């Protein structure tokens, strides 16, 4: 799907301030992303989500993340994620490839 090395660079620049990816990693401003793929929105244990995230009810996978990461607040109105999104599809695909490799 994407380039894992480029995706890691994007994660460090745009995501790591608020998220961790390793198993047992702590929640920061955003939840730890270990086990992200195949999990429903708003389900990371021990993280306090908005009702919007808890009730969205979609399963995270490559397709849902591709859409979400373009404009998080449009995809889940009411989310507390303050990230504006990534407009370039290739950059989102690289990030998703990295997340897939590092969160399971």
Curated annotation (Swiss-Prot):
Presence of keyword Mitochondrion: yes
Span of the signal peptide: none
Q: What residues bear N-acetylglycine in this entry?
A: 2
Q: How is it modified after translation?
A: Binds 1 heme c group covalently per subunit.
SUPFAM superfamilies registered for this protein in UniProt: Cytochrome c
Keywords assigned: Acetylation, Electron transport, Heme, Iron, Metal-binding, Mitochondrion, Respiratory chain, Transport
* Location(s), subcellular: Mitochondrion intermembrane space
Q: Which GO terms describe its molecular function?
A: electron transfer activity; heme binding; metal ion binding
GO CC terms, sorted:
mitochondrial intermembrane space
- Which Gene3D superfamilies does its entry note? Cytochrome c-like domain (1.10.760.10)
Which Pfam families does the UniProt entry name for this protein? Cytochrom_C
The residues that hold heme c are 15, 18-19, 81
Q: Which InterPro entries match?
A: Cyt_c-like_dom, Cyt_c-like_dom_sf, Cyt_c_1A/1B
Chief subcellular location? mitochondrion
Its function? Electron carrier protein. The oxidized form of the cytochrome c heme group can accept an electron from the heme group of the cytochrome c1 subunit of cytochrome reductase. Cytochrome c then transfers this electron to the cytochrome oxidase complex, the final protein carrier in the mitochondrial electron-transport chain.
Q: Which family does it belong to?
A: Belongs to the cytochrome c family.
Can you name this protein? Cytochrome c
Q: Which organism is it from?
A: Tetraodon nigroviridis (Spotted green pufferfish)
Its lineage reads: Eukaryota, Metazoa, Chordata, Craniata, Vertebrata
Name the encoding gene, please: cyc
């Amino acid at each position: 799907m994407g380039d894992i090395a480029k995706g890691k660079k994007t994660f460090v620049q745009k995501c790591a301030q608020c998220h961790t990816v390793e198993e047992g990693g702590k929640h920061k401003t955003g939840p730890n992303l270990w086990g992200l793929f195949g999990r429903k929105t708003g389900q990371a244990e021990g993280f306090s989500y908005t009702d919007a995230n808890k009730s969205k009810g979609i399963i995270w996978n490559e397709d849902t993340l591709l859409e979400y990461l373009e404009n998080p607040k449009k995809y889940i109105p009411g989310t507390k994620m303050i990230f504006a999104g990534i407009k370039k599809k290739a950059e989102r695909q690289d990030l998703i490839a990295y997340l897939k490799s590092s969160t399971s």
